[in-house]
Swiss-Prot record:
Substrate binds at residues 41-42, 63, 156. Transmembrane segments: none annotated. It catalyses: N-acetyl-L-glutamate + ATP = N-acetyl-L-glutamyl 5-phosphate + ADP. This is Acetylglutamate kinase. Its EC number is 2.7.2.8. The keyword Kinase applies. The gene is argB. One of its GO terms (molecular function) is ATP binding. PANTHER family: N-ACETYLGLUTAMATE SYNTHASE, N-ACETYLGLUTAMATE SYNTHASE, MITOCHONDRIAL.
């Protein structure tokens, strides 16, 4: 039976992906696994905004995105991050194709809270047919975390949230949320498994804090909507913390 795996990687991952990452991708392909990659790019966006003397502001951990900001975000993601990742895969003999929200209405979204965050959105529709067509051609889609509203406005989307939405609509078997740590740590030890009840307890006790909270919430959202397992880890070669029901 064909397995579907979605991988979310950071924006600087093209320079950091290891031979083991590419070897794992190649092995999965020999097992008839369908793979899609969602990439971030926050650091590159911030760097480009600074170079263009645009203010950088975050509210509740969410980047405030003006119309100029969304244009810069598109430049960073589609002009720098995605091409670098595609080239890194090409050098390893892995056939990919870069996609964005404008690729045949790939990701349709709506504004999250325009008064507070500007052009930041959430995804409510994924063109799964397009992704399946690319899989039939043995291509790995590499997807930028951007959405477009029904009236054509581009939106900035958190990459974890984008990967979660794509995994949900594709009914993926596995979702890997790659981060800079090897899993969810409690008292210095990496949890092998995390359930919704345990996650709530750890958050209530303030053991899980900061940037790990939205990542875990994304993982919980995915498993509650049909994704079998979500891995919070620093590499696809290690399961990390498996978030499951």
């Amino acid at each position: 039976m064909t397995k579907k795996i979605i991988i979310k990687i950071g924006g600087s991952a093209a320079e950091q992906l290891t031979p083991a990452f590419f070897d794992t991708i190649k092995y999965w392909q020999t097992q008839d696994t369908q793979i899609a990659i969602v990439h971030g790019g926050g650091d590159r966006i911030s760097q480009l905004m600074s170079q263009l003397h645009e203010p950088i502001e975050k509210i509740n951990g969410i980047r405030l995105t003006t119309q100029t900001g969304i244009n810069i975000t598109k430049m960073a993601l589609l002009g720098q991050v995605q091409p670098a990742l595609i080239e890194a895969c090409r050098q390893q003999g892995i056939a990919t194709i870069g996609l964005n929200a404008g690729s045949n209405q790939l990701l349709t979204g709506h504004l999250l809270d325009s008064d507070t965050y500007g052009y930041v959105g959430a995804i409510h529709q994924v063109n799964t047919q397009l992704i399946h067509q690319l899989w039939q051609q043995k291509l790995i889609p590499i997807i930028a975390p951007l959405a477009i509203t029904n009236d054509g406005q581009w939106l900035n989307v958190n990459a974890d949230h984008a990967a979660t939405a794509i995994a949900k609509y594709l009914k993926a078997d596995e979702l890997y949320l790659l981060t800079d740590v090897s899993g969810v740590a409690v008292s210095g030890n990496i949890l092998q498994e995390l359930t919704p009840g345990k996650a709530k307890q750890l958050q209530d006790d303030h053991i899980i804090t900061g940037g790990m909270i939205p990542k875990i919430n994304s993982a919980l959202h995915a498993v509650k909507r049909g994704v079998h397992n979500v891995h919070i880890t620093d590499t696809v070669t290690h399961p990390g913390t498996i978030v499951t029901l």
